[in-house]
């Protein structure tokens, strides 16, 4: 009895099951590959938005979950929202650093009223130094000439001799001697010596006062600048600070980089006021003392002329009182 050998080839049912399994695996492979990028993309979206109270869970990577159920993920390159206050702070800081804080730069950026105040104070300062130079040379020259004229008057023995010595017109000694001679000529027929002396002294006194007024001309401007320049500068400061506060209200920020340039421009006006006022006050006091010394020298010259007048009057009286010899027979 012969035994039948089993066939080595698979049966048709097993072959079909193997083919069906292979085709099913090929169908599920694209679905699994499509689900994996979706899960990876949802992770950066959750990290980019930490302020979200509850993040949506990432879909499962297996193929059992349908693709349509995955939540929509935010794009990775979406712009991050910036706080408006931070943007304003950065912008204000940039504007503050852009200001030129040199004196010329602050002048250019100042308000028109503050500019006018600064220009006026600068002109006042120039006037102060101009008066100091001009009046200083004038006083030094006048004092030097007057010392020489007083020395010449002291060497003179009579008013006529003094007029010959001080014959240069325009000098103070010439003016004093000329007025004294004019008064003596007008009072030639007067016998009262004291009346002549009083009239000559009065005329010399007026000349001394006039010379003092002439020498003091221009110094009143120094007093005016010294007393008003600080207040003018303060006005410019108040105006500039007022504009700074208005700018603060408009920009709605108290950042020091924005506020400081406007306040610095305002304070520059006060600084210019002090620069104009302090030298004016000092120079005015120096001139006041120097002019007082000049007036004292003029008074000395006037006293010397009055001394010569008194001497001439005494000589005239002695000549009139001298006896005359009369030849008899």
UniProtKB/Swiss-Prot annotation:
GO terms for biological process: protein import. Pfam families: MotA_ExbB. InterPro entries: ExbB/TolQ_transport, MotA_ExbB_proton_chnl, TonB_ExbB_1. It is found in: Cell inner membrane. Residues 35-111, 242-265 are periplasmic. The chain crosses the membrane at residues 18-34, 112-134, 220-241, 266-287. Sequence repeats lie at residues 30-34, 37-41, 44-48, 53-57, 59-63, 66-70, 71-75, 79-83. It is a multi-pass membrane protein. Residues 1-17, 135-219, 288-329 are cytoplasmic. Residues 30-83 are annotated as: 8 X 5 AA repeats of P-[AV]-A-X-[AP]. GO terms for cellular component: plasma membrane. Keywords: Cell inner membrane, Cell membrane, Membrane, Protein transport, Repeat, Transmembrane, Transmembrane helix, Transport. GO terms for molecular function: transmembrane transporter activity. It comes from the Bacteria. Its main location: membrane. Involved in the TonB-dependent energy-dependent transport of various receptor-bound substrates. Protects ExbD from proteolytic degradation and functionally stabilizes TonB. The accessory proteins ExbB and ExbD seem to form a complex with TonB. Belongs to the ExbB/TolQ family. This is Biopolymer transport protein ExbB.
């Amino acid at each position: 009895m012969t035994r039948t050998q089993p066939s080595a080839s698979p049966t048709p049912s097993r072959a079909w099951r193997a083919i069906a399994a292979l085709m099913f695996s090929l169908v599920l492979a694209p679905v699994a590959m499509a689900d994996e990028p979706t899960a990876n993309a949802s992770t950066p979206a959750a990290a980019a938005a930490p302020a979200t109270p509850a993040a949506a869970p990432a879909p499962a990577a297996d193929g059992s979950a349908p693709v349509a159920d995955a939540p929509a993920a935010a794009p990775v390159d979406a712009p991050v929202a910036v706080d408006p206050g931070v943007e304003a702070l950065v912008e204000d800081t940039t504007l503050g650093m852009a200001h030129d804080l040199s004196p010329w730069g602050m002048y250019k950026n100042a308000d028109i009223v503050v500019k006018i105040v600064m220009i006026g104070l600068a002109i006042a300062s120039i006037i102060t130094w101009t008066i100091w130079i001009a009046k200083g040379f004038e006083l030094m020259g006048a004092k030097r000439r007057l010392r020489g004229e007083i020395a010449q008057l002291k060497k003179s023995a009579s008013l006529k001799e003094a007029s010959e010595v001080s014959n240069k017109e325009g000098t103070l000694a010439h003016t004093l001697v000329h007025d004294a001679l004019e008064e003596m000529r007008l009072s030639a027929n007067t016998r009262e010596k004291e009346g002549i002396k009083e009239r000559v002294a009065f005329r010399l006194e007026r000349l001394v006062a006039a010379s003092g007024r002439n020498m003091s001309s221009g110094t009143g401007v120094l007093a005016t600048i010294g007393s008003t320049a600080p207040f003018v500068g303060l006005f410019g400061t108040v105006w500039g600070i007022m504009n700074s506060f208005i700018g603060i209200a408009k920009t709605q920020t108290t950042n020091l980089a924005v506020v400081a340039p406007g306040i610095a421009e305002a304070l520059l006006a006060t600084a210019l006021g002090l620069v104009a006022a302090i030298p004016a006050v000092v120079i005015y006091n120096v001139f006041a003392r120097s002019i007082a010394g000049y007036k004292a020298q003029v008074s000395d010259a006037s006293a010397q002329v009055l001394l010569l007048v008194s001497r001439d009057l005494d000589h005239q009286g002695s000549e009139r009182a001298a006896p005359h010899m009369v030849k008899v027979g």
